[in-house]
């Protein structure tokens, strides 16, 4: 299977000289900051957070290190801003009204593909880094919480057994995160529908075994 490719590039453009009006200057500064963060995310995800210095970032971005320090105080700040931004996007998505598993998965894959390096930093790199793990825990716990609520209202037996319900919710969170990571790195975009069908059928099978007293199944 061909691996999916990212359109991100580590090279960043240089702003033209000049002193525009304050509002335009602020907008340009924000655009520049966003551009730098996207490029930094690609380098950090590829090389590893702890193995990448500010010098290495600047070199691979093709800019002087002073440019990075003009926008960010440290590499740690860059990493945390990247993680918080993708986590905020994830939280915004998950706060929407539930419209079914299929719809949710479409939105999740779209988000992860559009921000592949950032999502991998959140879902993989922060999970293995003690200092950054709280970001991963927020991602993981959001899936656990939503799954727990769905199971609680769908199954009388699981409603009364919080331990088993939490076990199921934890399993679903781990399953989905691992599946999404693997798919955005290896699955072709034009086969996303196959991923949605596979994920939906997999969860249906699990829920059927976990909730024999319920007629609810993911759609």
Residue positions per predicted region:
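Amphipathic alpha-helical packing segments from all-alpha helical-bundle domains
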Residues: 130-156, 163-181, 194-211
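Alpha-helical structural segments
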Residues: 31-42, 46, 60, 70, ...
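C-terminal effector-binding regulatory domain of bacterial HTH transcription factors
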Residues: 210-219
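Basic, helix-initiating cap at the start of DNA-binding domains
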Residues: 1-47, 51-60, 76-80
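Short, hydrophobic secondary-structure boundary micro-motifs
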Residues: 120-123, 135, 192-193, 215
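Secondary-structure edge/capping motif, primarily at the C-terminal ends of alpha-helices
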Residues: 97, 119-126, 154, 180-187
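Short hydrophobic/aromatic patch on the recognition helix
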Residues: 54, 61-72
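Short helix-capping/turn signature of helix-turn-helix
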Residues: 72, 124-129
């Amino acid at each position: 299977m061909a691996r999916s490719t990212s359109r991100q590039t580590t090279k960043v453009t240089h702003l033209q000289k000049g002193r525009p009006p304050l509002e335009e200057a602020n907008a340009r500064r924000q655009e520049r900051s966003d551009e730098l963060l996207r490029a930094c995310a690609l380098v950090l995800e590829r090389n590893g957070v702890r193995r990448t210095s500010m010098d290495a970032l600047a070199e691979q971005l093709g800019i002087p290190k002073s440019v990075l320090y003009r926008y960010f105080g440290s590499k740690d700040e860059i990493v945390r801003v990247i993680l918080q931004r993708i986590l905020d996007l994830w939280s915004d998505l998950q706060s929407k009204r539930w419209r079914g598993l299929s719809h949710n998965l479409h939105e999740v894959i779209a988000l992860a593909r559009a921000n592949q390096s950032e999502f991998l930093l959140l879902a993989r790199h922060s999970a293995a880094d003690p200092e950054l793990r709280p970001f991963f825990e927020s991602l993981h716990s959001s899936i656990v919480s939503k799954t727990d609520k769905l199971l609680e209202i769908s199954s009388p037996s699981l409603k009364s057994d919080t331990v088993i319900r939490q076990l199921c919710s934890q399993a679903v969170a781990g399953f989905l995160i691992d599946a999404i990571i693997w798919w955005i790195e290896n699955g072709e975009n034009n086969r996303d529908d196959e991923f949605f069908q596979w994920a939906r059928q997999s969860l249906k099978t699990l829920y059927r075994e976990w909730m024999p007293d319920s007629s609810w199944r993911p759609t």
